[in-house]
Amino acid sequence: EAYVSVYEQVNPAVVNILVGSGQGSGFLFDRAGHIVTNNHVVADGGQIVVNFDDGRQLPATVVGTDPSSDLAVIQVDASQISDITPVSLANSDALKVGQIVIAIGSPFGLQSSMTTGIISALDRLFPSAVGPDGTTYQIPNIIQTDAAINPGNSGGPLLNLRGEVIGVNTAIESPVRGSSGIGY
């Protein structure tokens, strides 16, 4: 029942983001209509359409991006979503290996999908953007999880059992591009 409660609490604030021929996930961060996602979800530019679970589709604009951390903030018209409660954030300093986690997102475009797992490790490094000189930035403090993360989950929230965001699902490391690998 704890999983059902978290899903019902958080899922209305989790979105599917369409950008050109690509898609990913994100979550409503505040009442001003700001949505957190991954930079690689919106980096190709073009028109951004945000799909909410209740069927609302809203255009979005990019507010800011950080390719080095692979994070981006987009914004929709807040007056159109005033009935949706934004997510809450947890204190990431309190995370423990073995803690149960929940991922909600749109793997393969399947909006509002939930998977569960545990925190497999903390403080991993993960390569991110390539700079103009060819060097790559390592994203620090990455949470490794065994919750199934697939293409399309990028930008969605990783949650604790209180429904608080503890991380942003970013990538999967797998030789077969599926959930048989390690999620971050």
Explain the meaning of each model-derived region:
Residues E1-Y184:
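Serine-dependent protease modules
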